Amino acid sequence: APPTGLPIIPVMEGWIANPDGTTSFSFGFINRNDVPVDIPLGTANYIEPAKYSGMQPTHFPAGRSTGVFTVTVPASEADNDVWWHIKTGAEEALKVPGRRGASAYELDFILPRPQGAMQPHAGFGENGARLPGLFAQVGEFDGNVRAGEPVVLTVNVEDISERDSTDPRFVEPIPMGVHFSKYQGPGEVMFEHHESTVIPENPYEEGDRRFRFFRQLEPGDVQVEGGRGIANVVATFSQPGEYMIHTKVENFRAPDSSDGDQCCWTNIVQKVTVTQ
């Protein structure tokens, strides 16, 4: 969709004091429209200082997207603001600073949550190295991709959370949610379930009050059972160009993990070159 409608609101989620002395600023956004909005990199979507611009999203799904990417700065720049600017069509330009200092905004999910939840680890392909983090790694898809032809994208994931096995809630590993979405690119990306994806059925009868709270998997979503596994999705790109696919891996079925808790999930981004 063109950059029109209600403005995209950039959000600074918080700051992270990394063990190596660097500081990371976590950013998300709010799209108050009912449809996705695309804002290309440039004068309507940029980060200052300019050296940090380029890896922010250009595709904004409807609703609230929390902790989508980070900007990491060296210790020597920890006290300098990093600004994300967004302008939606004719709307007023909005900006938000990544800023270190306020303890209320410090994100400390390097430590386990009260019930043991931690960020899952995620890697590319079936055997790629797994890492945790809000912008854990950026990789290149090494296959040939043509516009209009489906391609399988694969990630491998593991939940390293250490939970109390005597607690009946944690007898079995918590399922992980894996969510593929367009991050950057000139055209549309259509996702479909891979044949390996198991689609959970609503376990409740229609008369049960819990029935309406069950959510079916969206086409870009996969549920991984057992604490470790592979997630595949089928993606079709509408036109040639350079794309990025964002994958969010979460363990939100745990009682101490959610977007509202600012923990626990990992983001990885895969670059895909699409030819005619």
Predicted regions, residues:
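Short, compositionally biased P/S/T/A/G/V-rich stretches that sit at domain boundaries
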Residues: 8-12, 103-145, 164
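Contiguous beta-strand segments within globular domains
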Residues: 20-26, 142-164
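Short amphipathic, basic-aromatic surface patches that mediate peripheral association
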Residues: 31-36, 157-170
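Short acidic/polar inter-strand loop motif in beta-rich domains
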Residues: 88-95, 251-257
